[in-house]
Amino acid sequence: MTTVSQNQVVVETEDKQDNLLRLPYFVSVEQLSADDVLHLLQRAQYFKNGGEVPALSRPIFCTNMFFENSTRTHTSFEVAERRLGLTVIPFDPSHSSVNKGENLYDTELTMASLGIELSVIRHPENAYYNEIIRPKEGQHLQMGLVNAGDGSGQHPSQSMLDMMTIYNEFGHFDGLKIMIVGDLTNSRVARSNMEILNTLGAEVYFSGPEYWYNAEEFSKYGTYVKNIDDEIPELDVLMLLRVQHERHNGAEAKTEQLFDAKDYNAAYGLNQRRYDMLKDDAIIMHPGPINRGVEWDGDLVEAPKSRYAVQMHNGVFVRMAMIEAVLRGRKLGGLE
């Protein structure tokens, strides 16, 4: 059975087993086809609409291992886990044996030995997950894994909640004009979103300081626009990115010296003038946290075209669907 929501997007109201995603792990949007994304969004909408949560046949223990700071993602995953009936075991990196030199594989091996079957991990190293999902010869770790962000690599749960927010608004992706603005080089959100939006048929544009734009990497996914004012009136979605000062080290250190908050806001920030230039049905998004007065003028964060709070709300249900996909993929708790 299907129904139509207030914004005319067709959503599922019944538990359709044939459309459920099943994955051994969820680490990158590169795992997903366009159909996979739509099925995941349908499932997330099912949960958002109050759909019945599948009953587990036995307790499933999980843990959230965040080696980088997080408010939205960490809390959202824990809410999602508890809604699904999982037993959440606390993990604090600052009080773990990681500080004694234990590597991530051995930390996960410890968790698996204690009966934990699912880990949600955020880690500063790009593609940290490879040592967990592709054990070396002689290693036997079995662990369900959801990637909550790896360095500047991937952020699949943020990408999926962004897709849900866009889909709820427009009912499709094909031909939508979406501009991603800001610290592109250092953004895992930009990478995940440009890949999946390309798969879904959207027209992607990029803007931001040229020292944060790598044409070799980004140009195959969209068009770089130097002056965002040239495109703003045509956009369906304006997606702002946080300036990630904590990643401006090493080879990126020189960009921190070039950066000026006032200049950035003048060139790329969402102010009242640019807000008024947007179409009436355009929406503004941001993965958070927001640097108010830099990427987004503070008095516009909750303006009518903003979907910032909606994104965060959708995140719980998307993460429920992602976790369920891994539970089913690994046949945990009687789910298949």
UniProtKB/Swiss-Prot annotation:
It comes from the Bacteria. Keywords: Pyrimidine biosynthesis, Transferase. Pfam families: OTCace (PF00185), OTCace_N (PF02729). L-aspartate binds at residues 100, 188, 242. InterPro entries: Asp/Orn_carbamoyltranf_P-bd, Asp/Orn_carbamoylTrfase, Asp/Orn_carbamoylTrfase_sf, Asp_carbamoyltransf, Asp_carbamoyltransf_Asp/Orn-bd. Its EC number is 2.1.3.2. GO terms for biological process: 'de novo' pyrimidine nucleobase biosynthetic process; 'de novo' UMP biosynthetic process; amino acid metabolic process. Pathway: Pyrimidine metabolism; UMP biosynthesis via de novo pathway; (S)-dihydroorotate from bicarbonate: step 2/3. It is an enzyme of class 2 (transferase). The keyword Transferase applies. Gene3D superfamilies: Aspartate/ornithine carbamoyltransferase. It catalyses: carbamoyl phosphate + L-aspartate = N-carbamoyl-L-aspartate + phosphate + H(+). Belongs to the aspartate/ornithine carbamoyltransferase superfamily. ATCase family. Heterododecamer (2C3:3R2) of six catalytic PyrB chains organized as two trimers (C3), and six regulatory PyrI chains organized as three dimers (R2). Catalyzes the condensation of carbamoyl phosphate and aspartate to form carbamoyl aspartate and inorganic phosphate, the committed step in the de novo pyrimidine nucleotide biosynthesis pathway. This is Aspartate carbamoyltransferase catalytic subunit. The gene is pyrB.
